[in-house]
């Protein structure tokens, strides 16, 4: 089902979770608006969106792909990964910074070759929420990040 057709479910929800979708839409605000119409008053929406900061290395990869004229085909993805592994792309000399998705063909396509990608800053996220009269409740951080932010000793990260 297309997210913009979610009203066709003819249901409203207490909680809506949307991850990995809005940032690939032509107009994420339009997608969010469609979801809000299916949310009960006082309900919650949990969003998973791309971060401008967190994806800085992915942006470098996407720029390299564009410069090389590579396509999101299996051959194009393999050629890109081969160039990274062979050290031909100096900005991307460390594949682990691209994450585990880099090593799977379908995941790498979504990671680096997707035709539509919006990335959010805290300011643009707040603007999106304000435009839709939503209240920001907080970020859900991975445990590893929580350890970094809540503990000053590097030894606790081992």
Segments from the language model and where they lie:
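Beta-sheet entry/capping signal
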Residues: 14-15, 41-47, 133-138
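A short SAM/SAH-binding and catalytic strip from SAM-dependent methyltransferases
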Residues: 13-29, 45, 51-53
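Short secondary-structure boundary/capping segments
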Residues: 12-14, 32-34, 52, 60-66, ...
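A short glycine-rich, Lys/Arg-flanked "PGG" loop and its adjoining helix->strand segment in the class I
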Residues: 29-44
């Amino acid at each position: 089902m297309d997210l913009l057709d979610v009203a066709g479910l003819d249901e409203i929800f207490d909680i809506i979770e949307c991850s990995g979708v809005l940032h690939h839409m032509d107009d994420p605000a339009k997608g969010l608006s469609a979801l809000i119409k299916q949310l009960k008053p006082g309900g919650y929406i949990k969003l998973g969106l791309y971060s401008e900061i967190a994806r800085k290395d992915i942006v470098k990869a996407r720029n390299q792909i564009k410069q090389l004229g590579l396509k999101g085909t299996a051959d194009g993805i393999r050629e890109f990964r081969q160039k990274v592994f062979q050290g031909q792309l100096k900005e991307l000399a460390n594949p682990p910074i691209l994450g585990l998705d880099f090593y799977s063909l379908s995941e790498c396509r979504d990671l680096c070759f997707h035709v539509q990608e919006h990335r959010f800053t805290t300011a643009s996220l707040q603007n999106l929420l304000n435009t839709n009269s939503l209240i920001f409740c907080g970020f859900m951080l991975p445990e590893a990040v929580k350890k970094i932010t809540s503990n000053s000793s590097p030894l606790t990260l081992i």
